[in-house]
Regions:
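Catalytic cores and adjacent flexible loops of soluble metabolic enzymes
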Residues: 1-227
């Protein structure tokens, strides 16, 4: 059985601190992950003004806008991430949440793209990602069969390689909700590689997914669950 491609999802668990990000990258490398993944958003494009202006106390200020902006890295930080990943010899890539962020990631020579579960319903975004012609991991959390049909059709039409990632979008996911047999159903229905993006505590479900022949495994990482 071939080992799955291991993705350490850092997301925004760096808390806006490049030193924390580098520690997470090093830990992922030391633990045997093949790559680390970040999330990139253009805050003003992803959230509406009403949401951004709501009161929210955080280390970055008193509004949701302050918090969201405080958690975003920009080019200076991503340049450092790019260089550091080369230094420790690990791949990195990002899941963009809007087209501007997708274009931003073009600044770097990345092998992969990632469609977050929430973005699988955005037809325009899917088309733009598929046009990049980078191998793309497509998470299927919360999606219907029609959503997945549409995404697969777009990537095939653009001749862009992809794999689906079975995902249950609860945090943390209960073991009894894993529904791992979906992995086999996705393989059969779409004749493609299928991975697993896990949100559960522990490793038992992930190990079971590996036994079902997943080609990629994504797990969230942090230095401290209280951060």
């Amino acid at each position: 059985m071939k080992n799955p491609y291991l993705i350490a999802e850092i997301g925004i668990n760096h808390n806006g601190d490049i030193n924390v990000a580098k520690k997470l990258i090093k830990n992922a490398k030391d633990c045997g992950f093949n790559s680390v993944k970040f999330q990139k958003r253009t805050i003003e494009a992803v959230y509406d003004e009403k949401t951004l202006n709501t009161s929210r106390e955080s280390p970055w200020g008193k509004t949701t806008r302050d918090q969201k902006l405080g958690l975003e890295f920009e080019k200076l930080q991503y340049d450092e991430i790019d260089n550091y990943c080369k230094e420790v010899d690990i791949e990195w890539f990002g899941s963009a949440w809007d087209i501007k962020s997708l274009e931003f990631l073009d600044n770097y020579n990345l092998k992969f793209n990632k469609i977050a579960s929430a973005m699988i319903v955005d037809q325009e975004f899917l088309n733009e990602v598929a046009k990049k012609n980078r191998h793309t991991f497509i998470s299927t959390g919360m999606s219907t069969k029609e959503d997945i049909d549409n995404a697969v059709s777009i990537f095939k039409k653009n001749n862009c390689s992809f794999e689906l990632m079975h995902c249950v979008s609860t945090y943390p996911m209960k073991v009894e909700d894993a529904n791992l047999l979906t992995i086999n159903e996705l393989k059969k229905e779409y004749n493609c590689n299928v991975g697993y993006s896990g949100h559960e505590n522990g490793v038992v479900v992930s190990l079971a997914a590996i036994m079902l022949g997943i080609t990629s495994l994504e797990r969230h990482i942090t230095l401290d669950r209280t951060m």
